[in-house]
């Protein structure tokens, strides 16, 4: 994407639109409800937030920077609230161009198992970020998704191994006795992965 096209697209995107694109880059797949909970929190009611998020996502879809998967949560009758969103190649190129990066990704319709697992991971991630926003004395200092949260370590024989959790989270809990900071690697298990794959992670 050349600079002129990127600039023209940027002129049509609000700060919240940009944040939605960055969320989709970070989390890979998000439902309309996830994005509503993350970015449409300043509305008078949940219904108003739902309508605003649906309008914004349809506008971003019309601009060609996001796409709804063919698969929906809860079936077609649930309407736009059931949509699962991802960046398009255009959306990814726009973000990459805005940072001056050359790397490219391919965007394909993911399989059902990947979608289910990714949405489960993101349910937890969004819940933690909501708790950070609403719960007094609790904060999320860092939340890393794959592959940014992967860690390299040495095995028993000195060989290089990798830890590949779904999420890495650092939280802080304040309390009368000073509170504490907790570091956690989180793995979401839906009972669909074989044991050797889990052990390999």
Where do the PLM segments sit?
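Amphipathic alpha-helical dimerization/coiled-coil segments
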Residues: 93-143, 181
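Nuclease-adjacent, charged terminal/linker segments that flank catalytic cores
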Residues: 1-108
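A generic fold-level signal
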Residues: 15, 79-80, 119, 162-164, ...
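Active-site metal-binding core of divalent-cation-utilizing nuclease and nuclease-like domains
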Residues: 6, 71, 135-184, 190-194, ...
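Soluble or luminal CAZymes and related metallo-dependent hydrolases
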Residues: 52, 116-120, 197-200
